[in-house]
């Protein structure tokens, strides 16, 4: 007889890990409320406590790095936008001069 492995979404895992301390539950209580095997929930909670987070979560350093990258991209996009605005105004004036 083969045993099917249950797959859980990242969101479900994160919510399950948050539920245990928020409701001051033991692993066994949390597992029974969520209809999970005790060992599974225990592994998720242990990983979260060790700083590994839930699967799919990122570290603070990774998030800060992404923020810096996004800020640089935003500044570049703003600069390009400003250049295009000035170019549009310039060519609009040139067009008006040529039509008079």
Swiss-Prot record:
UniProt keyword annotations, A-Z = Transposable element
Tell me what organism the protein belongs to: Shigella sonnei
- Pfam families assigned to the protein according to its UniProt record, in alphabetical order: HTH_Tnp_1
In its UniProt record, which GO terms are filed under biological process?
DNA transposition
* Protein name per UniProt: Insertion element IS600 uncharacterized 11 kDa protein
Give the UniProt family note. Belongs to the transposase 8 family.
Q: Which domain of life is it from?
A: Bacteria
Stretches of the chain forming a coiled coil according to its record? none
User: SUPFAM superfamilies from the xrefs?
Assistant: Homeodomain-like
